[in-house]
């Protein structure tokens, strides 16, 4: 059924100092589809992504997933983020004192997996990205590209229905950036998830099924 963004608007401030950042945003993303959000700085991309992830409330409109408001699927937005959504950010944000395996098993346990289930799932994901020999390594022992690959698998640990990525390759060189985005796309396709990524790097557009352009808080094309 996919994800339907319906008339999402966001205004900051009050009375005379109001700023409308998003203006009646409408688009759909099908299951298994990977789209890129693009637009100049200040066009509303990150604001939109944070609303989709339940990190920020919209002023009006709704986001519908599987026929129901995304924000009503759980008792609170923390449960939404933990169970339905996987986040990938510009920086990996790995916990410095946790080993690679533990970075993932921690998420699994928080979503209700047993220790055995979480370890099995984490090892499966880390093997997919060729890091099965680094399970007991700490983040500082990995390259930047390896750290970001761990962050991607961490985002997929809870079998999310939706993956949101905000400039996940901004700190990587061109070859690593291509590798990371190809990996994100591959996982979205294989698991029929919904993928939405923000990037300014036009060389990465080829990995998207569709580009959604934002301009001044509005959809320019989709």
UniProtKB/Swiss-Prot annotation:
Gene Ontology cellular-component annotations: plasma membrane
Annotated PROSITE patterns: ABC_TRANSPORTER_2
Gene3D superfamilies per the UniProt record, alphabetical: P-loop containing nucleotide triphosphate hydrolases (3.40.50.300)
tRNA-binding among keywords: no
Membrane topology label: Peripheral membrane protein
Subcellular localization(s) per the UniProt record: Cell membrane
Domain ABC transporter: 3-222
Leading EC class: translocase
Binding residues annotated for ATP, in chain numbering: 39-46
Keywords annotated in UniProt: ATP-binding, Cell membrane, Membrane, Nucleotide-binding, Translocase, Transport
Keyword Kinase attached: no
Function, in words: Part of the ABC transporter complex hrt involved in hemin import. Responsible for energy coupling to the transport system.
Family statement: Belongs to the ABC transporter superfamily. HrtA family.
Name of the protein in its database record: Putative hemin import ATP-binding protein HrtA
